[in-house]
UniProtKB/Swiss-Prot annotation:
Source organism phylogeny: Eukaryota, Metazoa, Chordata, Craniata, Vertebrata
PROSITE patterns referenced in this protein's UniProt entry, alphabetically: NEPRILYSIN (PS51885), ZINC_PROTEASE (PS00142)
UniProt protein name: Endothelin-converting enzyme 1
Record Gene3D superfamilies: Collagenase (Catalytic Domain), Neutral endopeptidase , domain2
Gene transcribed to yield this protein: ECE1
Natural source organism: Cavia porcellus
Cofactor(s) this protein cannot do without: Zn(2+)
């Protein structure tokens, strides 16, 4: 239908172009006029009949011309034909059900686009938030469940290990039989815990090494291997701040506002201490309060995330010897050689540290804290991470705390959902081939690649029109955009059984021993991390597994990654109008692409190296442009609590830039392919549909507790403001919805970076 409509339009234009001399009306009718003066005849010589006929003919002619003109204008400006296919009717129904058309789109587009969806979708039991991402993840979970529970002879060893892990998790009978025994034995093996029994008093360094490497906890600080930001072809050890049990330092420091959470956290700590064999509850509570006070001391020296956005300022490369001087409470060479064994670490080993002041202060804190408390704190980190692998009593304790922390209503979620999530989280690449074969069409990579190419072209077109950027920086920015590498669906190695098995060769899953399997995985994953230290970074090493409903940009690799899990509806559907696909996956692509040029990504060059490649004039101009967004988003609030416009700046830049690039790409597509059919009954143009599709991707609901947590931890703005903030900055949105200047969705002062 679309191509037929396009050909019809061209045919009509060809007809007009082929006409001969004379005035041409929009319908192609030619009317020739002879010279009036040379052919006129005196009115007085006409008979009455002639005069009456002439007047009548003149009136008829005038009426005919008026009718033809009106018909011509209507014909010329008619809307595209309506799509009445089953797919179009279905997507129209979904859109209508999500909308609240009684809301003025120029007043509150989020409520206009999502009001119906929000009314029909209260936060489900067992969840603290719900939206399009959640719905798609539930769909993916059901697929993974089926795949894990139905063995086939063709699966690889890695896939079989994922199935064994999942089935051990599902064996609740065995888990209930073991109760707390697996963790209690582990604590005893580590030298004990004063909360539940005697402990080894001179074991600080050994305990720290074991809980860091074998069990992937991060008390005091985190240690990991990643590409060196200033030499992206080389991996290097990183040391950074860490160690809080709650999601943000704000929970500890704003005690009045977060009193309910702090009390709930302490009660949770006490409950776990009791379940693990602690005796007197008052004694347990007293020691757990000391741990909480120690975490509060850590929170006091922890740097807020909004002050860590400029990596040029916080990046410091030191040697192991210099690190020893910086933070002497840890014997760094023995520590590093133990956790990275068999890799040898000497005093000249380069180490990247962020927030040198934090490491200095945490070293002082360790040296001035009682050894019993330090051990209690380290073991608490282990308990907090591993208790979910134990029996139902621990699950109940988790749920009770989650209700306080996130407002999650207590519910008996099916066990399989927990087990699918944990298996995917730990062995997602192992089960990846099953998921890809079941869900990912062969041509999906090509389709996604075409969309990325169109978005990238549109972004570069916008780049060429920026007035605040100098020409040299613009040229380098275009080179960086051209160099961005696309990773779609899955890393190639997972589809080769031999390569996949090689990756998981050193991991063994044991039937019916869930806790043991989880502990083995933590140890295995650290060994994989340690092995990367002397290897070059690898593009095939993804930070997200194939089923994940998400996407990301890697600055050191200068690549954008789109797992298979995010490519279905509502982000992309083959049968949907292009307006919806560009508003869905198109904006997602544009968002990740723009991250290469947000306040953090812009500091990396086309090769993924952190260096000052912008001219100072453009750096200053960029900062001025971004301050507008900081102020804009800081004026938004949820339940009276403001959005942190500084902390969310990078994501806000990406949201705005992604929307702009996707809209421009859609316009380019229409110019090339012709107008699409419209959807029935909506009364919307396809340009309006593009913006509506974008907004409905972000329809979501959250509990008040979850909203509070998001405001102080999430670098993304709340969904409502991801929609309102981006659209109110879009001139094209205001034009298509005819929003009056000065209305909420069309403010006179708009922010724009890219």
């Amino acid at each position: 239908m679309m191509s037929t409509y396009k050909r019809a339009t061209l045919d009509e234009e060809d007809l007009v172009d082929s006409l001969s001399e004379g005035e041409v009306y929009p319908n192609g009718l030619q009317v020739n006029f002879r010279n009036f003066r040379s052919s006129q005849r005196c009115w007085a010589t006409r008979t009455q009949v002639e005069k009456r006929l002439i007047v009548l003919v003149a009136l008829l002619a005038a009426g005919l011309v008026a009718c033809l003109t009106a018909l011509g204008i209507q014909y010329r400006t008619r809307t595209p034909p309506v799509c009445l296919s089953e797919a179009c009717v279905s997507v129209t129904s979904s859109i209508l059900n999500s909308m609240n058309p009684t809301v003025d789109p120029c007043q509150d587009f989020f409520s206009y686009a999502c009001g119906g969806w929000i009314k029909a979708n209260p936060v489900p039991d067992g969840h603290s938030r719900w939206g399009a991402f959640s719905n798609l993840w539930e769909h993916n979970q059901a697929i993974i469940k089926h795949l894990l529970e139905n063995s086939t002879a063709s699966v690889s060893e890695a896939e079989r290990k994922a199935q064994v892990y999942y089935r051990a998790c599902m064996n609740e009978t065995r888990i209930e039989e073991l109760r707390a025994k697996p963790l209690m034995e582990l604590i005893e093996k580590l030298g004990g815990w004063n909360i539940t029994g005697p402990w080894a008093k001179d074991n600080f360094q050994d305990t720290l090494q074991v809980v860091t490497a074998h069990y992937r906890t991060s008390p005091f600080f985190s240690v990991y291997v990643s590409a060196d930001s200033k030499n992206s072809n080389r991996n290097v050890i990183h040391v950074d701040q860490s160690g809080l049990g709650l999601p943000s330092r704000d929970y500890y420091l704003n005690k009045t506002e977060n009193e309910k959470v702090l009390n709930g956290y302490l009660n949770y700590m006490v409950q776990l201490g009791k379940l693990l064999g602690g005796g007197d509850e008052n004694a347990i509570r007293a020691q757990m309060q000391q741990i909480l006070d120690f975490e509060t001391a850590l929170a006091n020296i922890t740097i807020p995330q909004e002050k860590r956005r400029d990596e040029e300022l916080i990046y410091h490369k030191v040697t192991a010897a210099e690190l020893q001087t910086l933070a002497p409470a840890i014997n760094w060479l023995p520590f590093l050689n133990t956790i990275f064994y068999p890799v040898e670490i000497n005093e000249s080993e380069p180490i990247v540290v962020y927030d040198k002041e934090y490491l200095e202060q945490v070293s002082t804190l360790i040296n001035t804290t009682d050894k019993c408390l330090l051990n209690n704190y380290m073991i608490w980190n282990l308990v907090r991470k591993t208790s979910s692998f134990l029996d139902q009593r621990f699950q109940d304790a988790d749920e009770k705390f989650m209700e306080v922390m996130y407002g999650t209503k207590k519910t008996c979620l099916p066990r399989w959902k927990f087990c699918v999530s944990d298996t995917e989280n730990n062995l997602g690449f192992g089960l990846g081939p099953m998921f890809v074969k079941a869900t990912f069409a062969e041509d999906s990579k090509n389709i996604a690649s075409e969309i990325i190419l169109e978005i990238k072209k549109a972004f570069e077109e916008s780049l060429s029109t920026l007035k605040w950027m100098d020409e040299d920086t613009r040229k380098s920015a275009k080179e960086k955009a051209d160099a961005i590498y696309n990773m779609i669906g899955y890393p190639n190695f997972i589809m080769d059984p031999k390569e996949l098995d090689k990756v998981f060769n050193d991991y063994t899953a044991v039937p019916d021993l869930y806790f043991e399997n989880a502990m083995r995985f933590f140890n295995f994953s650290w060994r994989v991390t340690a092995e990367q230290l002397r290897k070059a970074p690898n593009r095939d090493q993804w930070s997200m597994t194939p089923p994940m409903v998400n996407a990301y940009y890697s600055p050191t690799k200068n690549e954008i990654v789109f797992p298979a899990g995010i490519l279905p509806a509502p982000f992309y559907t083959r049968s949907s109008p292009k307006a919806l696909n560009f508003g869905g996956i198109g904006v997602v692509v544009g968002h990740e692409l723009t991250h290469a040029f947000d306040d953090q990504g812009r500091e990396y060059d086309k090769d993924g190296n952190l260096r000052p490649w912008w001219k100072n004039s453009s750096v200053e101009a960029f900062k001025q442009q971004t301050e507008c967004m900081v102020e804009q988003y800081s004026n938004y609030s949820v339940n009276g609590e403001p959005v942190n416009g500084r902390h969310t700046l990078g994501e806000n830049i990406a949201d705005n830039g992604g929307l702009k690039a996707a809209y421009r790409a859609y316009q380019n597509w229409v110019k090339k392919n012709g107008a699409e059919e419209t959807l029935p009954t909506l009364g919307l143009t396809n340009n309006q549909l593009f913006f509506l599709g974008f907004a409905q991707v972000w329809c979501s609901v959250r509990t008040p507790e979850s909203s509070h947590e998001g405001l102080i931890t999430d670098p993304h703005s709340p969904s409502r403001f991801r929609v309102i903030g981006s659209l109110s900055n879009s001139k094209e949105f205001s034009e298509h919805f005819q929003c009056p200047p000065g209305s909420p969705m069309n403010p006179r002062h708009k922010c724009e970076v890219w």
